[in-house]
């Protein structure tokens, strides 16, 4: 069985994601497609607009065979740790033949060259990087300049490095490739050219609209019929069903009052979070005293040094309670389990294959004894239940994987 994998967030799933699924199947000629997906919080620093089980069900209805959860520790981490968490879980299964991701450049060789250099850090690169850093240049810019100079004999590559490293999906792709190299993985990487609007684009566009634009529309409008052109049919119908049911779409503004209450109640321990450098905690506290929306709060805190998504992840981590854990030790370890969210009949065959070839624990229900990584996921769902009326406290203990039979795609 030829098994391919994709790493996704689906916040929410749109036509661009459907294109990714179809192209992955064409490119890899796979018999089964495994999706490792962020759960109730996503890497850009938001609560997911739909809960993880609903997202997983929509994914299965649109061509994915097995959905497993990316632990919240990784889904709320930098691109480096987000990628490593996903790739290390996939690699541990010992049955994944390939991974396919979207990138703006759509050129796997160019991305692999950069990934190899950044991971191996050859002496010439180290010297160039140090020289630029000594001039007071920021790390990201110094890294780019060092790579350009290192590739000075390759005109096409040197001219495109800055462009490659300025685009988010390229950066994420490079991190996937670095993780594969670091793990000495046999998983073969593929990339497709990302189609449609930039993820920051908040305007709806014909055929391929960004997840941001769809979330913005849902936040401001009750009539969602216009979204039929931008969502897979099964996803659109699920949205309509949820609206009829009175489902609360989880929006980041809903989280802010809980965060403000936590702060004024005396929980001033942001400094325990990895991404909170000296002084950033006080900057956040001051902003919490006078800002009541996510955008105004993050907008006041962000700077050239502190990116929007980094601040968003910090707020989500604080909301969940990450500051009470030894995050450094957790991020240095590798996951020893996979959590199944949804499957079809092909996915069940994949699970049987994993059981034969891997020692990774497969969780379809929460075990009596949970490790720290899984405990964080449970805390994340409990925090998320404050934002989403469809999710109960301790929902993780009540839910079994969604099994959808006879899906034809």
Curated annotation (Swiss-Prot):
It catalyses: cytidine(34) in elongator tRNA(Met) + acetate + ATP = N(4)-acetylcytidine(34) in elongator tRNA(Met) + AMP + diphosphate. InterPro entries: Rossmann-like_a/b/a_fold (IPR014729), tRNA(Met)_cyd_acetate_ligase (IPR008513). Pfam families: HIGH_NTase1 (PF05636). One of its GO terms (cellular component) is cytoplasm. It is found in: Cytoplasm. ATP binds at residues 7-20, 102, 169, 194. GO terms for molecular function: ATP binding; ligase activity, forming carbon-nitrogen bonds; tRNA binding. The keyword Nucleotide-binding applies. Its EC number is 6.3.4.-. GO terms for biological process: tRNA modification. Keywords: ATP-binding, Cytoplasm, Ligase, Nucleotide-binding, RNA-binding, tRNA processing, tRNA-binding. The keyword tRNA-binding applies. Transmembrane segments: none annotated. NCBIfam families: PRK13670.1. Catalyzes the formation of N(4)-acetylcytidine (ac(4)C) at the wobble position of elongator tRNA(Met), using acetate and ATP as substrates. First activates an acetate ion to form acetyladenylate (Ac-AMP) and then transfers the acetyl group to tRNA to form ac(4)C34. PANTHER family: TRNA(MET) CYTIDINE ACETATE LIGASE. Belongs to the TmcAL family. This is tRNA(Met) cytidine acetate ligase. It comes from Clostridium botulinum (strain Loch Maree / Type A3).
